[in-house]
Amino acid sequence: PFHPGLGNFVTCEDLRWEMGDEYSVQTVGISTAMGKALGRAGTPVYRRWQEAVLRFQQGRSPTHGAVWLTHYPTLMIEWYPNVLVVSSLVAKGPQQTTNVVEFYYPEEIVAFEREYVEAQQAAYMETCAEDDEIALRMDQGRAALLARGDDEAGPYQSPMEDGMQH
């Protein structure tokens, strides 16, 4: 039920992982649903961004769907077509964290493609809201385990969750 927009923007069929002591990198391809790049949108918000990507790319498929680099424990750098997103986590307490998100675009997009920027950020925020719900559910589950005196992890679904074991 989570990530219908992102899940139809990227494909994990060619998911690649690279892991080091303090980082992990995931690279995923661009979805080719219905036989063409970005052929089906999972949500109206993502449809708007997919159309903006294809318009800016003049119908050509982007090289990658996304590259997600996590530098433990507080930095994530995400590459999507024509945008770099940097997220920095700031701990406010044991149960509270602020995520500072910055978006970087090529000059041509910033100067002349406001629709691209707005569509991309709306799609990104849609996925963020889904991620927040997942994180809250995980926190509730971990709290329930702690209250029972249990400490369990996994099972992990490979290859999608290989980074969780890292």
What name fits each language-model region?
Residues 1-166:
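C-terminal catalytic domain of Rieske-type non-heme iron oxygenases
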